[in-house]
Amino acid sequence: MINMKVAISMDVDKISNSFEDCKYFLIVRIDDNEVKSTKVIFNDESGKKSIVKENVNAIICKNISEENYKKFSKKIEIYHAEGDDVDKNISLFIEGELSKISNP
């Protein structure tokens, strides 16, 4: 069973090509393998800090800089998004089908 919070880097209605340049983060709370709630955090000056404040357990993104990887990967698992579809990536995450990013 997955019970955690996940941050997904997004642009409008799809996964962003860049963690650093995304427009916002979608925070998804998953309990018992089901999405229970979502919340949007804009990627402004405090956006990336808000991910930590939200106590997320994982990040889903296409690309992440080495600097941010080092900053976040100590406490948060980082997964590589498959394509642009947000819902599909959430499902893949719940099913354990997304690959962890081990080196940006």
UniProtKB/Swiss-Prot annotation:
A Pfam family this chain is assigned to: Nitro_FeMo-Co
Highest taxon of source: Archaea
Name of protein: Uncharacterized protein MJ0327
